[in-house]
């Protein structure tokens, strides 16, 4: 048995409902990179789906019964509840396939791991309370960001193949794996956005201007509705980290 909507000639869209974390008001989109990741994937697939925000302070009984013990994000696909984000991504890519739905997997394996350590470096930096450790942790974050910047500025094989003039230095692609958003971007961009907002708010840290590949990447992402319209408000992200971001002390 398969969940595919096109099985046996049935070309109807599947019934999909995505449940994401709600914001402070209990209704708007809250800070949750994993929720945004799935929201972006479904939007990019071009499939019809509904989104329900879940207020974790007042989780309705029907949702508790639907996915007991589970925090958003999760989704229902033709009535089946799916709760593991990585498995949901894999399932959607295997089920919502061409010709009807675009393939979103990255072509280059390196695109899937680009920026993989940024969020852990950011978390260590933002949670630190000791002034004497701040500079080293900041350097660790900057180093991870620079590694991503280097990847974004390094031409992909197909860019090298098409660059016959030899006068173009570096890559000019829009996203991790080319000029289209892929699953790799859906994973990284929500986290990168949080890093940008929170590090500035609580540590007055800006992503260095000389990281041209990284800023090109962010500029292109902010030009896409699939990203900007699935982001939580900046104030939501800042509030989510109000208790996490620690004040620095000399003790």
From Swiss-Prot:
The chain crosses the membrane at residues 34-54. Keywords: Cell membrane, Cell projection, Chloride, Chloride channel, Cytoplasm, Cytoskeleton, Golgi apparatus, Hearing, Ion channel, Ion transport, Membrane, Mitochondrion, Oxidoreductase, Sensory transduction, Transmembrane, Transmembrane helix, Transport, Vision, Voltage-gated channel. Detected in lung and inner ear. Detected in embryonic cochlea, on microvilli-covered apical surfaces of interdental cells, columnar cells of Kolliker's organ, and on stereocilia of inner and outer hair cells (at protein level). Also detected in the eye, where it localizes to lens fiber cells in the lens epithelium (at protein level). Residues 1-98 are annotated as: Required for insertion into the membrane. GO terms for cellular component: actin cytoskeleton; apical plasma membrane; cell cortex; centrosome; chloride channel complex; Golgi apparatus; mitochondrion; plasma membrane. It is an enzyme of class 1 (oxidoreductase). Its EC number is 1.8.-.-. Inhibited by F-actin. GO terms for molecular function: chloride channel activity; oxidoreductase activity. It is a single-pass membrane protein. It is found in: Golgi apparatus; Cytoplasm, Cytoskeleton, Microtubule organizing center, Centrosome; Cytoplasm, Cytoskeleton; Cytoplasm, Cell cortex. GO terms for biological process: auditory receptor cell stereocilium organization; diet induced thermogenesis; inner ear receptor cell stereocilium organization; neuromuscular process controlling balance; protein localization; response to dietary excess; sensory perception of sound; visual perception. A motif (G-site) lies at residues 32-35. It catalyses: Na(+)(in) = Na(+)(out); K(+)(in) = K(+)(out); chloride(in) = chloride(out). The keyword Kinase does not apply. InterPro entries: CLIC, CLIC5_C_GST, CLIC_N, Glutathione-S-Trfase_C-like, Glutathione-S-Trfase_C_sf, Glutathione_S-Trfase, Thioredoxin-like_sf. Disulfide bonds: none annotated. Its main location: Golgi. Belongs to the chloride channel CLIC family. NCBIfam families: O-ClC. It is linked to Defects in Clic5 are a cause of the jitterbug (jbg) phenotype. Jbg is the result of a spontaneous mutation that leads to severe degeneration of the organ of Corti in the inner ear. Jbg leads to progressive degeneration of inner ear hair cells. Affected mice are identified by head bobbing, circling behavior and their inability to swim. They cannot hear well when young, and become completely deaf after 5 months. In addition, there are eye defects with aberrant development of the lens suture and formation of lens opacities. Component of a multimeric complex consisting of several cytoskeletal proteins, including actin, ezrin, alpha-actinin, gelsolin, and IQGAP1. Interacts with AKAP9. Interacts with TPRN. TPRN, CLIC5 and PTPQR form concentric rings at the base of stereocilia and may form a complex. Interacts with EZR, MYO6 and RDX; the proteins may work together as a complex to stabilize linkages between the plasma membrane and subjacent actin cytoskeleton at the stereocilium base. In the soluble state, catalyzes glutaredoxin-like thiol disulfide exchange reactions with reduced glutathione as electron donor. Can insert into membranes and form non-selective ion channels almost equally permeable to Na(+), K(+) and Cl(-). Required for normal hearing. Necessary for the formation of stereocilia in the inner ear and normal development of the organ of Corti. Required for the proper localization of PTPRQ and RDX to the stereocilium base during postnatal maturation of hair bundles. This is Chloride intracellular channel protein 5. It comes from Mus musculus. The lineage of its organism: Eukaryota, Metazoa, Chordata, Craniata, Vertebrata. The gene is Clic5.
